[in-house]
A protein has these predicted regions:
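Catalytic His-Asp segment of secreted/periplasmic serine-dependent ester chemistry enzymes
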Residues: 194-288
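Generic structural signal for well-ordered alpha-helices
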Residues: 137, 171-175, 215
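N-terminal secretory targeting modules
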Residues: 1-82, 268, 272-288
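Conserved SGNH/GDSL esterase-like catalytic core that processes O-acyl groups on lipids
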Residues: 81-83, 91-169
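Alpha/beta-hydrolase-fold catalytic nucleophile elbow
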Residues: 152, 188-189
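A short helix->loop->beta-strand "cap" motif at the edges of active sites that frequently abuts
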Residues: 181-183
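Residue-level recognition of beta-strand->loop/alpha-helix junctions
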Residues: 122-124, 189, 231-234
Length: 288
C-alpha cells in the first residue's frame, strides 16, 4: 500500500512549517501595522500638543499678583500663618485683583471663620512642577513657622509627562519637611485636565486620564505623609466642565476669579480644620 506524501512524517512537517511560517508572517505584519498606528498616533498627539500651546499662549504672562499680607487685620490678635506652595493655580495666575487669588481667598475666608487675622505667604511659582516643591520650601526665611500649608500642584506634571512616582516622591518630601515644622498640610489634588476645551481630542481625553491617575496618587501620598488631601476633580471639576466661560480666565487654562472662588471654597473646610488643629497645639520654639 502506498502512502500519500502528505501523510508521511515529512509531509506533516512541511505542512506544519507552512502553517508556522504563515502565523509568524501574520504576527509580523500585525506588529508592523501596530507600530505604524502608534507612530501616527504619536505624531497626531505631538501636533495637537503644539496646537494647544499656540491656542493657549501666554496672554496672562508668567507673573501672578502679589497677595502676601495680613488679611482680616481688623479682627485683632496674633495672625495665623498660612503658607501656599505649588504651581500657577496656587500662585493665583488669572486673577485680576489680589483679593481674588487662591491664597487671598483662603486667607480671608479662614480669618472670617476663625475670627482672627491671617498672614499669607506665597512661595508658589507659575510653571512649577512637583520637583520644584522642595526648592519653594528652601526659599522660606529662617525661623518661619507656618500654622497651615496648602499645596496645589500637578497640572504641569501631566503636560510635561513627568512620571507619577517622581511627582509623588517630591510631594511626600515637602509634606514631610512641613510636618517636621509642626505645620498642618492640605493638598489640593491635580485638577481634571479634561475640562480644558482648548485641548483637542484625543489629547484631552488622554490628559484627563493622566490627571485623574496623578490625583489618586497625590491623595494617597498626602495621607501617608500626614496631610489632608482635597479631591479638586470631584469638588469643582463639574463646574469647570459645565461653565468653562465663567470658570476659566481669558487663556482658557487658568481659573478666573469665580474659578478661584470655587476652588477656595472646596479647600476651605480642610484648611479650617488644619488651622484649628495647629492653633490647639503648642508652637515649636526652634527654627528650621
Amino acid at each position: 500500500m502506498r502512502v500519500h506524501a502528505a501523510f508521511t512524517p515529512t509531509g506533516c512537517n512541511r505542512g506544519v512549517s507552512r502553517i508556522g511560517t504563515a502565523f509568524v508572517v501574520r504576527i509580523a505584519l500585525a506588529g508592523a501595522a501596530l507600530a505604524v498606528v502608534l507612530g501616527v498616533v504619536r505624531v497626531v498627539l505631538v501636533q495637537q500638543a503644539a496646537l494647544t500651546r499656540r491656542r493657549i499662549g501666554k496672554p496672562l504672562g508668567e507673573d501672578s499678583l502679589d497677595a502676601d499680607r495680613v488679611w482680616r487685620r481688623s479682627l485683632g490678635g496674633e495672625p495665623l500663618e498660612l503658607l501656599v506652595l505649588g504651581d500657577s493655580i496656587a500662585a493665583g495666575l488669572g486673577a485680576e485683583r489680589r483679593k481674588e487669588t487662591l491664597g487671598a481667598r483662603l486667607a480671608k475666608a479662614t480669618g472670617r471663620r476663625l475670627q482672627r487675622p491671617v498672614r499669607l505667604r506665597t512661595v508658589a511659582v507659575v510653571g512649577s512642577e512637583s520637583p520644584d516643591l522642595p526648592s519653594q520650601f528652601d526659599a522660606l526665611p529662617e525661623g518661619y513657622l507656618p500654622h497651615v500649608a496648602v499645596i496645589v500642584v500637578g497640572g504641569n506634571d501631566v503636560t510635561h509627562r513627568l512620571p507619577p512616582a517622581l511627582s509623588a516622591q517630591h510631594l511626600h518630601e515637602v509634606i514631610r519637611r512641613l510636618r517636621g515644622m509642626d505645620a498642618e498640610v492640605v493638598v489640593g489634588t491635580c485638577p481634571d485636565l479634561g475640562a480644558l476645551r482648548a485641548v483637542p481630542q484625543p489629547l484631552r481625553r488622554i490628559a484627563s486620564g493622566l490627571s485623574r491617575r496623578l490625583a489618586e496618587i497625590q491623595a494617597e501620598t498626602a495621607r501617608r505623609a500626614g496631610a489632608e488631601p482635597v479631591d479638586l476633580r470631584r469638588a469643582v471639576g463639574p463646574m469647570f466642565f459645565d461653565e468653562p466661560e465663567a470658570m476659566f480666565s481669558l487663556d482658557r487654562f487658568h481659573p478666573s476669579a469665580l474659578g478661584y472662588r470655587r476652588t477656595a471654597e472646596a479647600l476651605l473646610p480642610a484648611v479650617c480644620r488644619a488651622a484649628e488643629r495647629s492653633l490647639s497645639s503648642p508652637r515649636p520654639q526652634e527654627t528650621r
